[in-house]
Amino acid sequence: IIALSVFVTELLSQMTLEEKIGQLNLPVVTSEIVTGETLSGNVVSLIRAGQAGAVFNAAGYETVYGLQKIAVEESRLGIPLLFGLDVIHGYKTCYPVPLGLASSWNMPLVEKVGRISAIEASADGINWLYGPMLDISRDPRWGRCVESPGEDAFLNGAYGTAMVKGIQGELRSDSEILSCVKHFALYGASESGMDYRETDMSPERMYNVYLEAYWEAIQAGAASVMASFNDINGTPASADEWLLNEVLRNQWGFDGFVVSDYNAIREMSVHGLGDASEVSKRAITA
């Protein structure tokens, strides 16, 4: 049996630069996404060429397993894909929205919802759930309050811990899949409750209120984190080295991976932070 670290090192040594960059690519398989542009190229061609490391929004056994078969059997190195999906309040079985579920204060029930959601999603080949969403939301004008456990830092932290444990378990079986804590950070505190807007906040308020729930989910073992759309004190979260490196990795000890939210890297360019090369560099080095 080859040690995982040895296997990964050997695999990396075989990869071209294009294939390594391709592992950072997360194409979408449907045009039914309303946030920004969707992929214009052929997803199957990208997978065959080793130009995709994960796929977003693939749903259904036939689609997921068909794409995974192409990745494993037809790409040069046969690296399997991650399949990410937003599962807000259940995959096949529909549960109360997070705001309602959290209001029960029943954390064993929250964990069970996460467990069943993971079991159902994994049966279709999904191995990466985009949740829990732990944005403190105190402005009712913000349109995504319903996805959050609410306004209380303690409750959000307890909810996040339970959901991470439910989704991931011990990550030892096919039905124990990756969670993704989002949206890091302060997404629910955007100016005037307007989505994507800037967030102006002191470090004291961040640490005492808004960062607590994310931290608790990380301590519970969350495997991945999604950076938020908003900027924080003038810096977009997706390119915020202080947030993603100093806080998340150095202070909190997070050793998983970070994913940008939908189209967030391209949007940094649209918002004037530089061309595609510049904003990509800022995101990767953050």
Where are these predicted regions, by residue range?
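Glycoside hydrolase catalytic-domain context in secreted enzymes
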Residues: I1-A286
